[in-house]
């Protein structure tokens, strides 16, 4: 977990005249190179992630763990020496997962590993029992005739392809975000998707989904990759595949969480801002170490290292731990709306987020 190249670029931007990186003096360059070396040798980012995942753990937005995470982030920034630490409110509806179960009833009875998608409704008091209709991808589902899925469970089995730069995510994620709407339009009573991820382990991967106001809401869940393979193998045998699906999930009243913001004040142009950050929330099925504990660790450490320089950065460095990114970018939107309302958008010289894991940095995008 080494925020080396990103830290170097950010420190150069914070130190330099806007859009004039080539005008850096030797002192600025030496300071940036020193930051890089300290980041390579140190473990500050790792220590932040270890603290977050141990002392808070999963941080589903709107739950008590969310509130604990906010207090943790505020205290951590203060302990790391930020000049100013403060909270800004972020309000959003709360989605809660209670339980999820699925099994094949026929032709070859066996359990399935699933997880409800974020925002999904439940199946109600009685589990859904229905025949499966499988689709290779979202486009195939869209092409199905109207009414062809009446009383059926749609299963979308497209795979996410692994690429270093993550470009396989975009083509795959439509099944998750749009699958429930498209399946309901064809008459389906539920939709299952292959987990949007490249793991071959038997763990289902959650993520947010969407409904449309003019289409009935149906339950939506993700199958683990091996279980999606299992459904494909059963369907290929030409016999009707029938499932039982039992999901309890709900969206409840609005909740107010907070963006947690820490600043290292600039020495010459404190009103001009370089922002970096990650999102503080996570899903509830793991510790949130990668998504996005890693980004929190990288950006907290970067800000703290800049703050430890003998000479403060020319511009203010603002580190933001955003609330509820997972379910709709609520924290980022609230931050942008607050800056627009205050007339402060033009003060931002750079905005960057770390939400791509903890491998070696190879580009600043």
Short names for language-model regions:
Residues 28-31, 44-49, 56, 65-73, ...:
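Stable alpha-helical elements in mature extracytoplasmic
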Residues 178, 199, 256-259, 282-365:
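Acidic/histidine-rich catalytic neighborhood of metal-dependent amide-processing enzymes
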Residues 48-53, 86-87, 134, 153-157, ...:
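Structural recognition of the beta-strand scaffold that forms the well-ordered cores
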Residues 32-40, 54-64, 119, 130-135, ...:
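Second-shell loop/turn segments in exported
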Residues 7-17:
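Bacterial N-terminal signal peptides
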Residues 39, 53-60, 73, 80-84, ...:
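Sec/Tat-exported extracytoplasmic proteins
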Residues 21-34, 39, 50, 54-153, ...:
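Noncatalytic luminal/extracellular "stalk/propeptide" segments of secretory-pathway proteins
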Residues 29-31, 108-146, 209-289, 301-304, ...:
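Soluble metallo-hydrolase cores and metallopeptidase-like ectodomains found primarily
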